[in-house]
Amino acid sequence: VERKVLYLKPGAKATAGLIEAVSERGREGDLKSVVVASTNGKTAIKLGEALKDVAEVISVTEFTYSDDVKKSMKKLGIKAVEKADLPIQDRRGMREALMLFGAGVKASLEVASVAAEKGLVEGNVIAVAGTKGGLDTALVVKPSHPDDFNNPDPSKRMAVLEFLALPRQG
């Protein structure tokens, strides 16, 4: 299978292009869920609107969403995980290695792991995140529970299967 990887300039302007790439990949039908790191929920709502008939959206934040955002998410069928414990944040070596690819790569893998830990996903997912108020990273991931990050059995570990979009560094 031949795929193009988008290289997006970090920030809010990247969001539309990323959502289009995620929608296109989602329409292939083999992925049921998109997990997004969304601090205030606004980018999750944009994704939810675009993916309404394509895939379920799960939004993860370490904070709490406003009541208005929660209402909008509920209308779109978005599952919200608030006050999430971010499992990569406390693993310095892993965190710093992933940050070489950009904050969105770390955050994408982190929220995929949170969704797996909470039992919200089955099978492979699209994991989405970004920086500077926008979405610039999308990966197809085999998620795992945080306890399995270093599992000696590779079939139980998280794996990045595809890069759909990455932030252009520098």
Question: Where does each model-flagged region fall?
Answer:
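Active-site glycine-rich loop that binds ribose-phosphate moieties when present
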Residues: 14-20, 107-112, 159
